[in-house]
Amino acid sequence: MPLVVVCGLPSSGKSRRTEELRRALTGEGRSVYVVDDASVLGAQDSTVYGDSAGEKALRAALRAAVERRLSRQDVVILDSMNYIKGFRYELYCLARAVRTPLCLVYCIRPGWPSRGLPVPGACESSDPAVSVSWRPRADYGEKTQAVGAVEQRAISPLANGGVPTAVPKELDPKDILPSNPPAVMTPESEKSAEPAPCAFPPELLESLALRFEAPDSRNRWDRPLFTVVGLEEPLPLAEIRSALFENRAPPPHQSTQSQPLASGSFLHQLDQATSQVLTAVMEAQKSAVPGDLLTLPGTTEHLRFTRPLTLAELSRLRRQFISYTKMHPNNENLPQLANMFLQYLNQSLH
């Protein structure tokens, strides 16, 4: 059955969307398997994305887990960032080899950096009630500028040459400006939501955002593409069902189709048949003149004789024919190996 690839930056709602889709499909009586980072990482944490070797091993483990589960009977959901388009192409080839459909669900959090095509609603300010494990540096800059403006207004009369007003002996505590900038206030929802032990460090989040390769529906391995912005936007379940269960699977091609199995004696018979043709050609050309059609025993094809052929030239063409035939073995061609070799000689000799 189909493969669903969930894509997006950390804390963009991928796991929640995965669980929502899993419940919807299991409610219809379908078998659904979820492959995520937690089932592969084990005791490691999310900092594995900061190590190129560890991240490469993680992608290999995710690909192997998907390949084990992928079949024509079960739905497999891959819940991971999947931010490298080359890795998404590998998943596309896996689905194509099994002849099962594939779709991509791209989760975007409003206000987070996006390097792909512009998505409506993705540049809106994020909801402060939703807790995150990091805070953009711009938030601190705006608050620091606001504090500096208050201090500048407090000393502006003195800076413009004005006369300071008399200060009463007893000042109201509310009128006294603090010497240090006020601390950034955190909403109660953010105070109560503690980051998970495997929270992504800010530097790692910035690095992931920079090297994130957003999916593009113009690429065949990224379509059909369903983009979901935020957690309030409903998941297009009807469109996803149509893409998974009503669309035709991509047709296999040579890179994803298994080669036909050859018998154990195929190479031996190939070597024997071409060797016999080579010996017969060398013998027949002794009494032939240019323009004759050489008839060889055990073949129905004819070889047009145009000039004397050397054994070295025929041996080179024989090696080329054997190398090509070994790449495409087929037991059905065993009786026609000699005729195929003669056809190859007619096309190669000038």
From Swiss-Prot:
Region (Disordered): 161-196
Any Pfam family matching the protein: KTI12
UniProt entry keywords in alphabetical sequence: Acetylation, ATP-binding, Nucleotide-binding, Phosphoprotein
Residues found modified as Phosphoserine: S156
Chain positions with N6-acetyllysine modification: K143
Listed SUPFAM superfamilies: P-loop containing nucleoside triphosphate hydrolases
Coiled-coil features, chain-numbered ranges: none
Keyword Magnesium part of the UniProt annotation: no
Protein name as it appears in the record: Protein KTI12 homolog
Source organism (scientific name): Rattus norvegicus (Rat)
Top-level taxonomy: Eukaryota, Metazoa, Chordata, Craniata, Vertebrata
The gene coding this protein: Kti12
